Regions:
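Short hydrophobic alpha-helical segments that form membrane-spanning helices or hydrophobic packing faces
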Residues: 101-105, 216-219
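Glycine-rich active-site/cofactor-binding loop and its immediate structural neighborhood
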Residues: 82, 86-100, 107, 111
Length: 267
């Protein structure tokens, strides 16, 4: 691999193997991350699970249908501004606003992810690319302490690979991103279980009394910036895989993970 590509992969490894959203939230709120969950009611988990699935469905139906496929630089600042605005509203109303605010934020984020994918040479007309964009939402955090072995980038890709392939075939056969197909429902459920962890962290931070509308905007800005970084890293890996082959990139990725101290058990 050329040196510039090795450096790009090194940056991607750091982003994908050491997501920093929780730490960023703690900095915004000025409180330890461990205190966040105390700000949420016990009933929040069901509401968050329902909202994340709804948001991913909405994003899959809407966001990439309006994206152009001509390669150009990703316009991340516009999407951040839009997400921050929706977060200001959500920060004022908390959990009650989640069913409205989260789908809006997720659609904005998926459009931004598609923008990044296109800039890295992906074809947004390809259903597999659409689903690879959606897959980014599963790459942003752990499901729990017991999930460490399954949280590495390639581990998550491997866990989702069958569902992504089946969903891509479903979309090709139907000609549209149809709602309600069993394979799509299964894939969205898998992604939502991981996306929901980050959503919970976001909502818990917004529920801290000192946050308010301004803090809600800051949290949503960090939220979309987090997934933009994940997307940039994810599609950097995919670009390098197209150039050098998957095996070469995987070997280089694992070597860098070891050197940087991020190595996990290989699944």
């Amino acid at each position: 691999m050329q040196e510039e590509d090795v450096q790009a992969l090194r940056t991607a490894v750091t982003t994908l193997e050491h997501p920093s959203f929780a730490a960023r939230l703690a900095e915004i709120a000025g409180k330890p991350i461990e205190l966040f969950n105390r700000a949420l009611p016990e009933t929040a988990s069901k509401a968050i699970a329902a909202a994340t699935s709804q948001a991913l469905n909405a994003a899959l139906r809407v966001a990439l249908r309006t994206m152009e496929n001509q390669p150009k630089a990703a316009s991340s600042y516009l999407h951040k501004a839009l997400a921050a605005t929706s977060g200001a509203v959500g920060g004022s109303f908390g959990l009650a606003a989640l069913p409205i605010e989260l789908p809006i934020s997720t659609v904005i984020m998926l459009r931004s992810i598609g923008d990044i994918a296109r800039a890295e040479g992906e074809d947004l007309r390809d259903p597999e690319t659409v689903l690879s964009c959606l897959q980014v939402f599963a790459l942003g955090g752990l499901k729990g302490e017991a999930d460490v072995a399954n949280s590495g980038y390639f581990a998550v890709r491997g866990l989702l690979a069958k569902s992504v392939a089946e969903a891509a075939r479903f979309i090709v056969d139907r000609g549209v991103v149809a709602e309600g197909g069993p394979v799509l429902v299964r894939l969205i459920a898998q992604i939502a279980s991981r996306f929901g962890v980050v959503v919970t962290q976001k909502l818990a931070a917004q529920a801290v009394p000192v946050i308010g509308a301004f803090g809600g905007a800051a949290v949503n800005y960090a939220f979309i910036d987090h997934f933009q970084e994940i997307a940039r890293a994810h599609f950097t890996v995919r670009r390098l895989e197209r150039r050098y082959g998957k095996d070469v990139v995987r070997m280089a990725y694992d070597k860098l993970s070891l050197v940087l101290g991020y190595a996990r058990p290989i699944i």
